[in-house]
Amino acid sequence: MIKLTRRQIIRRTAGTLFALSPIASAVAKTVRAPQFTAARIWPSHTYTRLTLESTAALKYQHFTLDNPGRLVVDIQNANINTVLHGLSQKVMADDPFIRSIRAGQNTPTTVRLVIDLKQPTHAQVFALPPVGGFKNRLVVDLYPHGMDADDPMMALLNGSLNKTLRGSPEADLAQNTTPQPGRGRNGRRPVIMLDPGHGGEDPGAISPGGLQEKHVVLSIARETKNQLEALGYNVFMTRNEDVFIPLGVRVAKGRARRADVFVSIHADAFTSPSARGTGVYMLNTKGATSSAAKFLEQTQNNADAVGGVPTSGNRNVDTALLDMTQTATLRDSRKLGKLVLEELGRLNHLHKGRVDEANFAVLRAPDMPSILVETAFLSNPAEEKLLGSESFRRQCAQSIASGVQRYINTSVLKRG
């Protein structure tokens, strides 16, 4: 038998007690626990997003309760801090989905969030790895419970976004009382889908003065919509508020409306502040045809990673679909882009004198002429000032609308 000295017995006993102590265990876990660094809420009529940013990946589980409706999210190996304590103050009174949020330390190692709901919801809870300027993120998306199964956003959640989506815009056309432009032989008014880039969690490019691309392009898109509707066209937008819409859903929204034209509007940045000018891009599935186009292709296609898309969702339209009627669509996209570029060239210096090409995910529609407009560079001091001007934004919108009108008159209406 091994004999222990009195000092050895005391040391072993103390070590065992400390190891078994709940307090000691909690303290040990506290040291390793991720720290919450930011919390954001993005309310919209499409869906509301809650984002928790942390220093390390979070383990979580969630469930719902009824009467009243609540979503409960338990975050393991975590400790409440000032970020979570301030979460309730971030809830907006006009949030369509969230009534209030409570956060507390449910157990020594578990933080519990209780989200009081205003209506029945479909909740998506998922984690995102670090990307761009973001750390690890835990995302809670709340969608209306009765969302139409054919809605492109619901198709993304169900993993069926790659199915060919065809909407029935006839009901919308019947309700539109704007003046009637010329019609094709089938009597259908031209349909235009405008796509303001980025939104919500994804700010897009940010100028040295703090101007965010997502706000600039939404302003331009709204004015473009007004200009086109004044001409009598049927105009829709992929987003009309500060909300993140995945790239594939943007394409699907246009296809669901059977859009004759899809215009994605941006105001990007480049590594050098000297880069300037307006540009128009069309799809090239083989990749970019210039170094600038390659840079923009990478930044724009990264939007889903920055904005946050559940990994179970199909992010983009299936590339197999691109074989369908692709030649005619690309030809029409080039014609549309050329006409819009000509109009924009009267307003601002052109980055290139021709339509550039890149493999932009948001342009991957097999049957919808699509272009991406870079209105100007937020990274250029002079153009940052222009983009901050309401007058320049309005002129951008007018130029885009004029180019679209020329395309519709020479292509869409002629073929009926």
Curated annotation (Swiss-Prot):
Keyword Cell wall biogenesis/degradation: yes
Organism: Neisseria meningitidis serogroup B (strain ATCC BAA-335 / MC58)
Family statement: Belongs to the N-acetylmuramoyl-L-alanine amidase 3 family.
Any one GO BP annotation for this protein: peptidoglycan catabolic process
Keyword Signal: yes
The protein's Enzyme Commission number: 3.5.1.28
GO CC annotations, alphabetized: outer membrane-bounded periplasmic space
Residues of the MurNAc-LAA domain: 192-405
GO molecular function, one term: N-acetylmuramoyl-L-alanine amidase activity
Chief location of this protein within or outside the cell: periplasm
Annotated Gene3D superfamilies: 2.60.40.3500, Zn-dependent exopeptidases
Extra remark: Present in outer membrane vesicle formulations which are used as vaccines in human.
Biological role stated in the UniProt entry: Cell-wall hydrolase involved in septum cleavage during cell division.
Endpoints of the signal sequence: 1-26
Keywords from the UniProt entry: Cell wall biogenesis/degradation, Hydrolase, Periplasm, Signal
UniProt superkingdom: Bacteria
UniProt-listed Pfam families: Amidase_3, AMIN
Subcellular location: Periplasm
Annotated stretches, region: Disordered: 166-191
Catalytic activity: Hydrolyzes the link between N-acetylmuramoyl residues and L-amino acid residues in certain cell-wall glycopeptides
Protein name: N-acetylmuramoyl-L-alanine amidase AmiC
